[in-house]
């Protein structure tokens, strides 16, 4: 038998999350973002649950090819475009839509020998300051690309830096408006946060990512608690050991947790080598036998300890939810000083996945 830890994926929930996105942006088409191996869920496991999407967006060429080989015939958007000029041969073969965010990509596309034009997304830097042409260059770049024989349909894209913050998207929208004044074009601007909270930015295509998987773009579950979105992944395990400790005894490496009175401690088959956050402190929420309790002490490579005081019936084999439907990944991440995105993407290869 394998260790009891596993990641369960509820594909029906993923379908429902996509439906919620559509209701949030009813006039827009949807790019379902499956980058980072579908945010750690496994693109081959989940893509069929998103089959009602209008297109898939990702980074990795190999994953795009996999989708084509599995039978997806709709659009595929490569969010960072091609990384080497020679990649354009595969983009041509598999009919991939490419982002163009820099001069070298523009020149490579111009010089490529393609069988048919590629649809492109011209990326404008609206304040994130990662990729994209500066707003004042946008129209020149647009006209250069429009004149190329290798270019098919064109869309203008940008990525909001603060769609989940009080500052919002006002300044970014102002920059985009200046960049595109007088330009007739389709737009794709909205990430998960803007899809939920900024309908004025929906335009033609939205690009939801983390919300499809049932986590919050702000990192706070409370911000999406009333949307109907639900977690797709449940990371669960079991108690494999129980210790009854006296006052003054300590738990884990470094003895970071000290028992103040007699206390039962459960040892769970899960640790940082499985993707559970190493820096999750004492008090991080966890569910034991359906009862909310907390971790205690330091997370080790293969195990962590939990307080069994609220669940005296718990013993060897008792189920533990590390995150999922009841213990939200955002809450675990917040306790550990990180984001739910990072935890979902970091589930280790040694953890078996099951789909329902």
Curated annotation (Swiss-Prot):
One of its GO terms (biological process) is D-alanine biosynthetic process. The active site is at 35 (proton acceptor), 253 (proton acceptor). Its cofactor is pyridoxal 5'-phosphate. One of its GO terms (cellular component) is cytosol. Substrate binds at residues 130, 301. It is an enzyme of class 5 (isomerase). Its EC number is 5.1.1.1. SMART domains: Ala_racemase_C (SM01005). It catalyses: L-alanine = D-alanine. Pfam families: Ala_racemase_C (PF00842), Ala_racemase_N (PF01168). One of its GO terms (molecular function) is alanine racemase activity. It comes from the Bacteria. Keywords: Isomerase, Pyridoxal phosphate. InterPro entries: Ala_racemase (IPR000821), Ala_racemase/Decarboxylase_C (IPR009006), Ala_racemase_C (IPR011079), Ala_racemase_N (IPR001608), Ala_racemase_pyridoxalP-BS (IPR020622), PLP-binding_barrel (IPR029066). The modification N6-(pyridoxal phosphate)lysine is found at residue 35. Isomerizes L-alanine to D-alanine which is then oxidized to pyruvate by DadA. Belongs to the alanine racemase family. NCBIfam families: alr (TIGR00492), PRK03646.1 (NF002970). This is Alanine racemase, catabolic.
């Amino acid at each position: 038998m394998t260790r009891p830890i596993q990641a369960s994926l509820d594909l029906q929930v993923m379908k429902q999350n996509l439906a919620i996105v559509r209701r949030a942006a009813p006039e827009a088409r949807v790019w379902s973002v499956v980058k980072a191996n579908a945010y750690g869920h496994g693109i081959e496991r989940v893509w069929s649950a998103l089959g009602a999407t209008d297109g898939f967006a990702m980074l990795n060429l190999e994953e795009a090819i996999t989708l084509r080989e599995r039978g997806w015939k709709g659009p595929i958007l490569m969010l960072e475009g091609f990384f080497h000029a020679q990649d354009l041969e595969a983009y041509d073969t598999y009919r991939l839509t490419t982002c163009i965010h820099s001069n070298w990509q523009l020149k490579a596309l111009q010089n490529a020998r393609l069988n048919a034009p590629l649809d492109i997304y011209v990326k404008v830097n609206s304040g994130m300051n990662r990729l994209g042409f500066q707003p004042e260059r946008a129209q020149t770049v647009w006209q250069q690309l429009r004149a190329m024989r290798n270019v098919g349909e064109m869309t203008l894209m940008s990525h909001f830096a603060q769609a989940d913050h009080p500052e919002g998207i006002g300044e970014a929208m102002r920059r985009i408006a200046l960049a595109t004044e007088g330009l007739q074009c389709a737009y794709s601007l909205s990430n998960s946060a803007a899809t939920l909270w900024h309908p004025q930015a929906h335009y033609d295509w939205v690009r939801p990512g983390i919300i499809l998987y049932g986590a919050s773009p702000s990192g706070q579950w409370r911000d999406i608690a009333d949307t109907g979105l639900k977690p797709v992944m449940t990371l669960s395990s079991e108690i494999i050991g129980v210790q009854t400790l006296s006052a003054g005894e300590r738990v884990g490496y470094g003895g970071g947790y000290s028992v103040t009175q007699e206390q039962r401690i459960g040892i769970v088959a899960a640790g940082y080598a499985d993707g559970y956050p190493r820096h999750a402190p004492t008090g991080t929420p966890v569910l034991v036998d359906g009862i909310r309790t907390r971790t205690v002490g330091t997370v080790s490579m293969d195990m962590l300890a939990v307080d069994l005081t609220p669940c005296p019936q718990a013993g060897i084999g008792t189920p533990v939810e590390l995150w999922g439907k009841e213990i939200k990944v955002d809450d675990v991440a917040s306790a550990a000083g990180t984001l739910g995105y990072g935890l979902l993407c970091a589930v280790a290869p040694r953890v078996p996945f099951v789909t329902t």
